[in-house]
Amino acid sequence: MQNNCHLSKLILEQAKKYGDRAALSYRDYTLNKWIPISWKQFALNVKKVSLALLRLGVQVQENIAIFSQNKPETHFVDFGAYGIRAVTIPFYATSSAAQITYMLNDAQIRFLFVGEQPQYDTAFSVISVARSLERIIIFDRSVKKNPNDHLSVYFDDFLNEQLADGVSDDLLNEYKKRLADANDEDLCNILYTSGTTGQSKGVMLTYGMYREGFRVNDAVLPLSENDVFLNFLPYTHIFERAWCYLGLTEGALQCVNLRPADVQRSMQEVHPTCMCAVPRFWEKVYQAVLEKMENGTFMERKLIREALEVGKRYWVN
């Protein structure tokens, strides 16, 4: 059943309901297996981020940027920011230095979270021209920092650094107040367009917009806590972002595909019951099926044709 609470409180509320049940899963490329993250762990990380950002002095509706490929940490930062009524702005992981510079300055970003080496290198290269940038926080511990970099910190060190002295009553009270004050008119995200017709434009999305989208989707295509989602499109894409959040409201398991090239492998491993993708992806899947059919035996070709017809009758006719 869909949880209709405000997104700023969603993960905390779902953790009360689902506890140690897996909320997220991601592939560990060193261990070569999928690692689950429980709702309880998810909520703990979200609250840590909220308190760490508050300790840094992040203001209500201040913009925070995330420059990363899909990772569980992006969810931690998103929902941690929502918990203190800050606004998150995701950048495409392939954005150029010029694009990053423009968005950082346009949104007056003080704190930038980055994913892996390519994003860090790009972010570090624009420090001198990013007028408001104060800190870069790096998700991936394997990133090699520039020897002259005195602005960056690893994500786990950032949390430990900000919370090392404990949480004061004043900080905790401010956190509780912001959670209580969160409303549907607050800005949730700013998503920058691709910039194909000039400079990128920042599209402002409120919590109320997401809430209405969830309501409509639930009426047309209801989901449940038994569903398994596979994240494929970047979280910068509003289709994927809204779909991910929809899954979280339903209590479904989200499998985070870290590398786009691995999506077919991920599908075979996690067996998603639902996912969103652009038409080009399904065209490629369909073409692969046709090629396999042409190279198969008579019986294999017959079975594939029959399966396609069944799908067509069910979904199209």
Language-model segment annotations:
Residues E62-N63, Q69-I89, A93-A97, N105-F111, ...:
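A short helix-loop-beta submotif of the ANL/AMP-binding
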Residues G19-A22, I138, D165-Y192, Q199, ...:
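Conserved pre-ATP/AMP-binding loop-to-beta segment of ANL
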Residues M1-C5, Y120, P147-L187:
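Flexible, low-complexity linker/hinge segments
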Residues L24-K71, D78-F79, S96-T101, Y154-D157, ...:
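Conserved AMP-binding/adenylate-forming core of the ANL superfamily
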Residues P36-W39, C188-F214:
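Conserved AMP-binding A3 loop
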Residues L51, L56, G83-Q162:
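Structural core segment of the AMP-binding/adenylate-forming
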Residues R211-V228, Y235-N317:
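Conserved AMP-binding/adenylation subdomain of ANL enzymes
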Residues Q2-S25, L44:
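A short N-terminal helical cap/helix-turn-helix that marks the beginning
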